[in-house]
């Protein structure tokens, strides 16, 4: 996760200088290389209603402000770089710099053997993996699944109550029953389960893959098609099904 989800701050250049050392096991993201850049919808849009109150969006959880390592740069241009107000020469989002969720790494807490200099938190070339325990089941997700079921039964009061168990823990504003929709639940899943859930499986289960990609992810929206809501059936499975005709899913040949 760290390798894919954290930015490659090594490549940040501003005023002809690099503000950061790399790889460092702090909130700059360890040994990230920026393959999975957060969308603007994920890093900004879904937090707008409670940007500063929701603990899940605090800077130690969703990192937007990065402490500068280069003392000369800090002296001239400031000791932090903010993705919401990037300095001269820095494009956000791009692989070198974007807002990311710190749970993809272990700031200041990498395994001892990965430090080339433990005092400065400099990492060696063997770093890049994630060493936090990964969740298989989450109570929060159980509440969100039940909220989804209540919504399907048109019981928005109970759906809101389940969502608010999670939001209360995160010190976020409670949601009103009138605000609960399937899209709201999907947003709450992003806020709570970002970098954790198998998002495509969730969206395909709900029949919302196409709609959400078109709404939230302009990069993939360019080539998104409706029939991607289902996977193609492997030809060998169709061929092996001799008892009856197994039709390929629409849109695939």
Predicted regions: what they are:
Residues 1, 9, 25-138:
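Flexible, polar/acidic helix-loop-strand segments at domain edges
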């Amino acid at each position: 996760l760290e390798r894919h989800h954290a930015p490659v701050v090594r490549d940040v250049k501003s005023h002809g200088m690099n503000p950061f050392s790399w790889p460092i096991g702090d909130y700059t993201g360890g040994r990230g290389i920026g393959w999975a850049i957060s969308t603007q919808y994920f890093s900004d849009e879904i937090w707008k209603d409670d940007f500063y109150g929701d603990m899940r969006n605090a800077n130690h959880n969703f990192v937007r402000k990065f402490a500068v390592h280069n003392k000369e740069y800090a002296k001239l241009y400031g000791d932090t770089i903010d993705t919401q107000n990037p300095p001269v020469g820095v494009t956000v989002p791009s692989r070198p710099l974007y807002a990311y969720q710190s749970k993809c790494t272990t700031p200041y807490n990498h395994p001892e053997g990965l430090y080339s200099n433990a005092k400065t938190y400099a990492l060696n070339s063997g770093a890049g993996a994630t060493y936090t325990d990964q969740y298989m089941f989450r109570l929060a997700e159980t509440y969100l699944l039940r909220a989804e079921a209540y919504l399907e039964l048109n019981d928005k009061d109970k759906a809101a109550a389940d969502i608010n168990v999670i939001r209360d823990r995160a010190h976020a504003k409670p949601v009103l029953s009138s605000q609960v929709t399937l899209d709201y639940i999907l947003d709450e899943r992003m806020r709570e389960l970002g970098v954790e859930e198998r998002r495509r499986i969730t969206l395909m289960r709900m029949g919302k893959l196409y709609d959400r990609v078109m709404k939230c992810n302009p990069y993939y929206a360019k080539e998104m098609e409706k029939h991607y809501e289902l996977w193609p059936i492997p030809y060998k499975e169709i061929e092996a099904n001799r008892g009856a005709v197994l039709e390929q899913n629409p849109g695939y040949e």
